[in-house]
Amino acid sequence: GDAWKPRQRTSEGKYVAATPERAAGTRKALGAIIDAGLAFVNHVAPFLCEPAVLDPAFQARFKAQMLDALVFAGLVGKFGANDSKFVGLTHTNLQLDNAYFWTADDGSLECGLLDWYMCSRTAMAQVWLGCLSGADGECLAGHDLAIFRAFSDEHEAFGGPRVPPEELLERFTLNFPSYIIGNISKIETHILSEVPAEKWKGLASKDDVLDGPWNARCFSLMIANGLSYWYHKGDDHPGAVMLRWAAKHDLVVGDAV
């Protein structure tokens, strides 16, 4: 095996010189994943997406924008936790059966956790990706900043530091390309493994999917909602936000691969 082969040796000069090759390899691998996602919505479950998302011109732009953005994804991961204002106690799988909500006699609402697994200090923006994963793409595109303003107001009202909503939205958006690629990568293992391609032919609407198995339902709708959100953000799509962020911090491709 590889363990018995001579160890590969490198140097700073060789590493820098190989950057274009690594970047090209990364784009090729990610491009194949994106193609698989587009093939899924085009040929297996087109009813999940609005016509504008299925337009070949949009899909070509989306793929190019994703590839330009994803090269900086690793740096975004480090950026996400670089300021304690944007890190808090979170639960990354807080389904309704993991918590309780009880209205007391005086009308106040008491809330708490029943299942503390996956409860930890985490970058808020990354958790928001899951919180809003079921939101209709067009609706989310029109109200994302308002949602983060409401959260920021409540966070401060209950004793937390002021979380600038515009910055929280930026951090949320910077994580979006990785979020989409992560969902697409689950097509074979989580979607088609539960509902094979031939069974999708018997479905006609999102309502049919909502009655289906958990993983197939969640990941297929997250892919569709993510594509819709990207489309409805227009020129302010996540790829553009990523490139503006990279330029603001003087980042180049060589910093990220």
For the regions a language model picked out, list residue spans one by one:
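Catalytic and GAP-homology cores of small GTPase regulators
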Residues: L94, N98-A99, T122
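Surface-exposed helix-capping loop/turn segments at secondary-structure junctions
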Residues: G1-Q8, H155-P165
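Active-site activation/catalytic loop segments of kinase-like enzymes and analogous catalytic loops
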Residues: M118-G160, P177-G202, F219-Y229, K233
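Conserved catalytic-loop position in the HRD/HxD motif
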Residues: N93, D115
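ATP-dependent phospho-/nucleotidyl transfer catalytic cores
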Residues: G1-H91, W102-D106, C218, M222, ...
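Catalytic loop of the DD-peptidase/beta-lactamase superfamily, centered on the K-T-G motif
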Residues: P213, R217
